[in-house]
C-alpha cells in the first residue's frame, strides 16, 4: 500500500531553519518496518520541510496515498485535527491513522476525526493494521487500536510492549531530509521505558515502566551506520534512562572503542544523578561522551519531594563535580513553577544553579500533561487556566490560589533570560 506519514509542525509559522531539531525517530521506525514488508512509504516532517497545510493538500492530491498516518503530541493536537479534516476533504478515500504520545494517552480525542487510533508503541500495530486493511479483513482483533464502528467506539485492548528491540529495523532516515537536522549530528534511541515515578512524566503511559534495552552490539551497529552513511560525527542519545543498566553502558563504551569509532556523543535527554558513578563517567568519557544533561529539576528539597525525584542535593553536587573534573560538559534540566513551588523555593533553585556553575542550563515550564499525576494534582489543588493544548510548554496552563500563573510566568522569563543564553 501507499502510505504517507506526517509529523506536524510545532509552531503555526514554520521557521526556515530548525537548528537543534531532532528527526522524528518514531515515524522513521514505523516507516522502516512497513517498507521491510514491501509497502511504499513517504515521511514529511513539517518542522523542517517548510510544508504549510496548503502545500500538504497539494501533495496529497498528487500522490493519492492509501493511508495517511499522523504522529500527535499534546501541543500539536489542534494542528493534527486540522490536518485530519483537510485530508478527509482532499482525499476522502484515504484511511487516516493517528498515533503518538497524545493519541496514546487520550485516544478518545481523535476517534471522531480519524479512522483508527494507534495506542502505545506503533511499529507492530501499524504493520498488522496495514496488512489487515490491504486484505480487506476485520481489524477488531488487532491489539492497540481504538476506532469507531457503527457509531460505537471499539477498543481492542493494549498491545504488549515490544521485548525484542533488536529485531526492529533501524529508522528509515533516508526518507528524511537528514541535512536539515544538526548537520553532522545524529540522534538514536537505545532503550525504552523508565521505572521511576516522577510526578510530571508521561513516558510510562506509552513505553511502560519496565526498562527494555537494545544490545550493545545492535546500538553500536546503528552508530557505525550513521557514521558511514551520513558522515555523523556526534551522536545524541535520546533515551529516558540510558545509564540505568551500568553493565550495558560499559559494554556499549567498549564496543565503540573496539571498533575505533572516533565519535563524540552526549546524553541529550538527560539521566539521573543517582544512576552514574565516577568510574562509569570515566569510561563514558574514554568512549567519546563529551556532554551529559542531568534531570535536576529543582534546588529545593521540598519541591524535589513533591516531584518524587528521589534524589538529594548533595548527590547532584557530587556528580556534577565528578563530571566536570573528568572533562565532560554538564547540563542541567530544571522544571520551574510546578507542584510545591513558591517564591522561596524558586530562590533556592536560583541559588543552586549559581552554585553548580553548569555549562548548560535548560529551564522548562512546569507542564501538567494529561493523565499524569501532575495533571491530577492540578485538578485537586488548583485550576487550569486554559484548555488550549497549543499553549502547553509555552506558558503556564494552570495556577493555584496562592501562586497565579502570571507570576509563575514572570519568574520563569527572568530565570530563562538569566541562565539559558547558552542552550
Regions found by a protein language model. Give the residues of each.
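Radical SAM [4Fe-4S] cluster-binding motif and immediate context
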Residues: 22, 166-333, 351
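Glycine-rich beta-alpha loop elements in corrinoid/cobalamin-binding modules
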Residues: 30-162, 365-367, 371
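Structural recognition of alpha->loop->beta junctions
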Residues: 109-126, 281-292, 348-363
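N-terminal [4Fe-4S]-dependent radical SAM core
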Residues: 4, 9-16, 142, 146-190, ...
Amino acid at each position: 500500500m501507499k502510505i504517507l506519514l506526517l509529523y506536524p509542525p510545532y509552531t503555526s509559522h514554520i521557521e526556515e531553519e530548525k537548528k537543534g531539531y531532532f528527526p522524528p525517530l518514531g515515524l522513521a521506525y514505523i516507516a522502516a518496518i512497513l517498507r521491510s514488508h514491501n509497502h511504499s512509504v513517504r515521511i514529511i516532517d513539517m518542522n523542517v520541510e517548510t510544508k504549510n497545510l496548503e502545500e500538504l493538500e497539494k501533495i496529497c492530491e498528487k500522490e493519492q496515498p492509501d493511508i495517511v498516518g499522523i504522529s500527535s503530541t499534546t501541543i500539536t493536537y489542534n494542528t493534527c485535527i486540522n490536518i485530519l479534516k483537510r485530508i478527509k476533504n482532499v482525499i476522502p478515500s484515504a484511511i487516516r491513522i493517528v498515533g503518538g504520545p497524545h493519541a496514546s494517552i487520550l485516544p478518545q480525542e481523535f476517534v471522531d476525526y480519524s479512522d483508527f487510533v494507534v495506542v502505545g508503541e506503533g511499529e507492530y500495530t501499524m504493520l498488522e493494521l496495514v496488512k489487515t486493511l490491504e486484505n480487506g479483513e476485520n481489524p477488531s482483533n488487532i491489539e492497540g487500536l481504538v476506532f469507531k464502528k457503527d457509531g460505537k467506539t471499539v477498543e481492542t485492548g493494549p498491545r504488549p510492549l515490544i521485548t525484542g528491540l533488536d529485531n526492529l529495523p533501524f529508522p528509515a532516515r533516508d526518507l528524511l531530509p537528514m541535512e536539515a537536522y544538526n548537520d553532522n549530528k545524529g540522534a538514536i534511541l537505545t532503550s525504552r521505558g523508565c521505572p521511576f515515578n516522577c510526578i510530571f512524566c508521561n513516558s510510562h503511559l506509552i513505553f511502560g515502566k519496565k526498562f527494555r534495552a537494545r544490545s550493545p552490539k545492535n546500538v553500536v551497529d546503528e552508530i557505525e551506520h550513521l557514521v558511514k552513511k551520513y558522515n555523523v560525527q556526534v551522536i545524541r542519545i535520546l533515551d529516558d534512562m540510558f545509564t540505568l543498566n551500568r553493565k550495558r553502558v560499559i559494554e556499549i563504551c567498549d564496543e565503540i572503542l573496539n571498533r575505533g569509532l572516533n565519535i563524540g556523543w552526549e546524553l541529550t535527554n538527560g539521566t539521573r544523578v543517582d544512576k552514574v558513578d565516577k568510574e562509569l563517567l570515566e569510561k563514558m568519557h574514554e568512549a567519546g561522551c563529551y556532554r551529559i544533561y542531568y534531570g535536576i529539576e529543582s534546588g529545593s528539597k521540598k519541591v524535589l519531594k513533591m516531584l518524587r525525584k528521589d534524589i538529594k542535593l548533595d548527590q547532584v553536587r557530587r556528580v556534577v563535580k565528578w563530571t566536570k573534573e573528568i572533562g565532560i560538559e554538564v547540563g542541567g534540566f530544571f522544571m520551574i513553577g510546578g507542584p510545591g513551588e513558591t517564591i522561596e523555593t524558586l530562590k533556592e533553585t536560583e541559588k543552586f544553579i549559581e552554585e553548580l556553575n553548569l555549562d548548560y542550563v535548560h529551564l522548562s515550564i512546569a507542564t501538567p500533561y494529561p493523565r499524569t499525576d501532575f495533571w491530577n494534582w492540578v485538578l485537586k489543588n488548583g485550576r487550569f487556566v486554559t484548555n488550549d493544548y497549543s499553549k502547553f510548554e509555552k506558558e503556564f496552563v494552570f495556577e493555584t490560589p496562592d501562586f497565579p500563573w502570571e507570576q509563575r510566568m514572570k519568574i520563569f522569563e527572568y530565570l530563562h533570560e538569566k541562565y539559558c543564553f547558552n542552550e
